[in-house]
């Protein structure tokens, strides 16, 4: 009673297929994949932008440990 058998999962799968249809499920998965891809791209853009902002503009002369 506490765990799901294979019959429970087959019934759930049948209901999902009836609700969404065969053609709609791949379309939904494609949209989810595009969303994840755009999210990762956005996170990568934020890291690049934050790395550029952390530079304070000072240069170090390697010959004489002097900061200009």
From Swiss-Prot:
Region (Disordered): 42-68
Its membrane topology: Single-pass membrane protein
GO molecular function: protein transmembrane transporter activity
Bias-annotated ranges (Basic and acidic residues): 53-68
Compartment annotation: Cell inner membrane
Transmembrane segments: 1-21
Keywords: Cell inner membrane, Cell membrane, Membrane, Protein transport, Translocation, Transmembrane, Transmembrane helix, Transport
Any one biological process term the GO annotation gives: protein transport by the Tat complex
Pfam family, one: TatA_B_E
Cellular component GO terms, alphabetical: TAT protein transport complex
Entry keyword Protein biosynthesis: no
Family per similarity comment: Belongs to the TatA/E family.
Job of this protein: Part of the twin-arginine translocation (Tat) system that transports large folded proteins containing a characteristic twin-arginine motif in their signal peptide across membranes. TatA could form the protein-conducting channel of the Tat system.
Subunit structure: The Tat system comprises two distinct complexes: a TatABC complex, containing multiple copies of TatA, TatB and TatC subunits, and a separate TatA complex, containing only TatA subunits. Substrates initially bind to the TatABC complex, which probably triggers association of the separate TatA complex to form the active translocon.
Alphabetized NCBIfam families for the sequence: PRK00720.1, tatAE
Protein's name in the database: Sec-independent protein translocase protein TatA
């Amino acid at each position: 009673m506490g765990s799901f058998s294979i019959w429970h999962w087959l019934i759930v799968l049948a209901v999902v297929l009836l609700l969404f249809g065969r053609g709609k499920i791949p379309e939904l998965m494609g949209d989810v994949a595009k969303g994840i891809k755009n999210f990762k791209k956005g996170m990568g853009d934020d890291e690049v932008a934050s790395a550029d902002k952390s530079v304070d503009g000072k240069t170090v002369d390697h010959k004489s440990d002097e900061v200009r």
